[in-house]
């Protein structure tokens, strides 16, 4: 089977739908995007699992999320002896209630999703410990400039079928 690309997928959609019209062609990017989003929600292949390493900023209760993170699995920090300490996930309300004064510091115990770009920890870190975040990454979206991704290389039939369903 030949490798699927953005170009071959858009042509396959036109062929399967027997529609070469401008209106249909203008919507193919939308069909592809919706199909990728659906697949990304419905499956969680190991190939999408990533790990990122960073460090706490002393006296800052916020940590930047990896830019491609969809779901956080684990949040770990390494103490001075390189012992891995897993933080427990909580809600941001819990963290604000547990550690209301952000200027007070300590060894972090909890984390919460704060926004699309940040995580919240408590207690506020008292040192710039190394951190590891395990997560499911977002799928790289297909486009005319990004012509292949995991789906075109590993699940061509699934991607085509999902696009046709849209």
Residue spans for each PLM region:
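Glycine-enriched, solvent-exposed interface loops adjoining structured elements
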Residues: 1-166
């Amino acid at each position: 089977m030949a490798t699927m690309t953005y170009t071959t997928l858009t042509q396959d959609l036109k062929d399967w739908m027997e529609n070469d019209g401008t209106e249909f062609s203008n919507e193919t990017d939308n069909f592809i995007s919706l199909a990728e989003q659906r697949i990304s929600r419905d499956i969680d292949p190991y190939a999408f699992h990533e790990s990122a390493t960073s460090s706490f900023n002393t006296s800052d209760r916020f940590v930047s999320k990896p830019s491609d993170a969809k779901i956080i699995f684990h949040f770990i920090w390494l103490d001075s002896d390189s012992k891995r300490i897993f933080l427990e996930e909580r809600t941001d309300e819990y963290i604000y209630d547990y550690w209301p004064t952000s200027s007070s510091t300590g060894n972090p115990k909890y984390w919460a999703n704060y926004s699309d770009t940040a995580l919240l920890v408590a207690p506020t870190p008292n040192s710039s410990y190394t951190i590891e975040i395990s997560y499911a990454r977002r799928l790289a979206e297909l486009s005319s400039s990004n012509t292949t991704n995991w789906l075109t290389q590993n699940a061509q039939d699934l991607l085509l079928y999902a696009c046709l369903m849209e």
